[in-house]
Amino acid sequence: VDIMHQVDIIEDVAIAYGYNNIEPLWRELPTTGEAKPDQHLINVARDLMVGLGYQETLNTTLTNSETLFTKMNMPNSPLIELANPKVITMTCIRNWLLPSLMEFLSVNQSVEFPQKIFELGKVTLLDHTKETKTRDENWLAAATAHPNANFSEIKSTLDSFMVNFGVEWQIKESSNPSFIEGRVGS
């Protein structure tokens, strides 16, 4: 059964009736469409990353706690879980992007190096101040994989990215269980 949402039922009805039999209804009032205010910034960020030699990946927002925490050596933290997941690989909504990139690299190990990838996508965070108790944010993550990959390479990417947006920044040593101690900055 391929019914995960109300839209799936509507799609099945449309298929049964026949898409070619559906007459379009045109609005009487002219309307103009435009991108959301942050979409221009997102497009510029994507163009910058491509210009820096990265390929964009598009991963699903649904994932599982093993990918988010266990495989990333992170302690479990609160996240949004699906009430009735259909598959064990999609039981929650991602709250950060890096696990998706690592999974992408993992299944593409046979692809020729270097692999330089990024994702600019939505993550969903718990936010009890909101009516829905959640907040969607656009995040950017990048990864590079090849025998000579190092901190300087990814830092120079970040430097170029920030300079193009006119942002002054500096990196400070930090720690994260997903990375080797002493090789993490934020």
Regions found by a protein language model. Give the residues of each.
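A generic structural signal for well-ordered coil/turn residues at beta-strand boundaries
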Residues: 76-78, 97, 114-119, 136-139, ...
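A carboxyl-terminal module marker
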Residues: 2, 6, 59, 129-136, ...
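Glycine-rich, charged/polar anion/phosphate-binding loops
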Residues: 66-68, 87-88, 102-106, 119-130, ...
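Small-side-chain structural scaffolding
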Residues: 14, 100, 142, 185-186
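Extended, well-folded interaction surfaces typified by the phenylalanyl-tRNA synthetase beta subunit core
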Residues: 1-115
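Hydrophobic alpha-helical packing residues
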Residues: 45, 120, 158-161
